[in-house]
């Protein structure tokens, strides 16, 4: 009897336990999955940091200074014999196209589209690029050094430098000719923050504490609750434009240093473009460089699908501006200088030239793009046309090239649609670190 009683009690307890266990097991599985992911992520991060330490060129505290020529050319007398272009000033004069260009590629500002324009121009005219070594950037977020350039030796001459870097003027200046045009692009700080947050937040550890569906709004409610100025990749989510341009993004926005640095940027850069007025910016670029209209034709690259765009209501917009106050001051300053340049160019001429640019772009869309618009990554038929995606989500759109294209446009169409990483490979850049990271992500389905 006693044994039967024990047996009954035992079965009774087993029933209750099975119910409890059925509730606990999913939690345990979730915790196990999270722990495995955390451990794997930590190991991979450590591996990539170790890889970076081995792959990164050594710091060179002393480097023989050999002056570069006044202008570079990759074949004899190029600068002198280059065909003259009709001046954009509209006065009938002719000018030589500018060959030496430094484009400071800022993040999330349509800079990949400008990069494609520069790649095409440089390739067409056999210009020499200063490319990164092993990656698609110059070891960002470290400050740029000449030793980061693939196959660099003191005194080497380059026409174009345009990949992502953290700008360091003194180092760049020693790499390019004295006649080099310095160009960059900015974006409204609120929409810029929204774009940066979407693209980068998964690789910024302090955001992992955020809860709810709208993590950006949650962060902006009390940024200092989460933000760590010294945290890994923290720069992506606070005054990123100022950081990219080489300055401290965490200084007090009211510090006189902010205005000093902004005026320094104005002195160093010949043109600061604005994403919100992209076509007008390209017309000013053409004017500055004395290029043909055909040189600045483009398709919009690395655009996000609409479903991933956060709605910036007035409250969130205001908080994003407040949080990125230095970038707001930077943008305001160059918004003023931009319209001064447009005024000097002439409003009627600008309107006419923008219209012509848009019409030619529309014509090429009909000629080149299957369906006439960008498509989701899953709908891209040619793997060589797949754009680089942010970690954990495929939100960047791409294109399908038409099957039948007139021979006259076939090469141009493909070049205009080729994503950055693939174009760099075609230009001979060694991207072994970038490609290794891509394979790891593909294997882990990140």
Predicted stretch roles:
Residues 3-17:
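N-terminal intrinsically disordered, acidic low-complexity segments at the extreme N-terminus
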């Amino acid at each position: 009897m006693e044994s039967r009683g024990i047996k009954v009690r035992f079965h009774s307890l087993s029933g209750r336990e099975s119910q409890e266990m059925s509730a606990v097991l999913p939690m345990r599985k979730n915790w196990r999955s999270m722990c495995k992911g955390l451990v794997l992520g930590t190991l991979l991060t450590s591996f990539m940091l170790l890889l970076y330490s081995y792959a990164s060129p050594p710091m060179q505290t002393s480097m023989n200074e050999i002056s570069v020529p006044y202008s570079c050319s990759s074949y004899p007398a190029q600068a002198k014999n280059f065909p003259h272009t009709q001046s954009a000033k509209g006065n009938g004069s002719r000018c030589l196209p500018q060959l030496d260009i430094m484009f400071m590629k800022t993040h999330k500002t349509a800079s990949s589209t400008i990069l494609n324009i520069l790649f095409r121009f440089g390739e067409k005219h056999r210009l020499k690029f200063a490319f990164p070594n092993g990656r698609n950037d110059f070891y960002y977020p470290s400050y740029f050094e000449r030793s980061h350039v693939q196959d660099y030796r003191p005194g080497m001459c380059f026409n174009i430098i345009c990949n992502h870097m953290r700008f360091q003027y003194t180092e760049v200046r020693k790499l390019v000719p004295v006649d080099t045009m310095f160009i960059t692009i900015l974006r409204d700080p609120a929409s810029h923050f929204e774009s940066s947050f979407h693209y980068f937040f998964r690789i910024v550890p302090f955001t992992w504490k955020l809860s709810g569906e709208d993590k950006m709004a949650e962060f902006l409610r009390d940024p200092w609750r989460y933000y760590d100025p010294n945290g890994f990749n923290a720069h992506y989510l606070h005054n990123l434009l100022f950081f990219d341009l080489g300055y401290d993004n965490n200084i007090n926005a009211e510090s006189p240093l902010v205005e000093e640095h902004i005026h320094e940027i104005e002195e160093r850069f010949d043109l600061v473009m604005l994403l919100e007025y992209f076509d007008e910016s390209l017309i000013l670029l053409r004017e500055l460089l004395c290029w043909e209209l055909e040189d600045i034709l483009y398709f919009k690259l690395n655009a996000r699908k609409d479903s991933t765009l956060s709605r910036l209501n007035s409250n969130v917009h205001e908080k994003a501006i407040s949080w990125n106050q230095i970038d707001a001051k930077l943008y305001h300053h160059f918004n003023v200088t931009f319209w001064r340049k447009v005024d000097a160019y002439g409003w009627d001429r600008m309107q006419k030239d923008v219209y012509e640019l848009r019409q030619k772009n529309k014509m090429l869309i009909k000629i080149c793009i299957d369906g006439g618009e960008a498509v989701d990554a899953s709908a891209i038929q040619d793997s060589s046309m797949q754009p680089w995606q942010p970690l954990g989500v495929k939100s960047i759109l791409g294109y399908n090239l038409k099957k039948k294209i007139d021979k006259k446009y076939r090469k141009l169409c493909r070049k205009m649609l080729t994503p950055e990483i693939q174009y760099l490979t075609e230009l001979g850049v060694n991207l072994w670190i970038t490609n290794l990271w891509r394979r790891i992500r593909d294997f882990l389905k990140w």
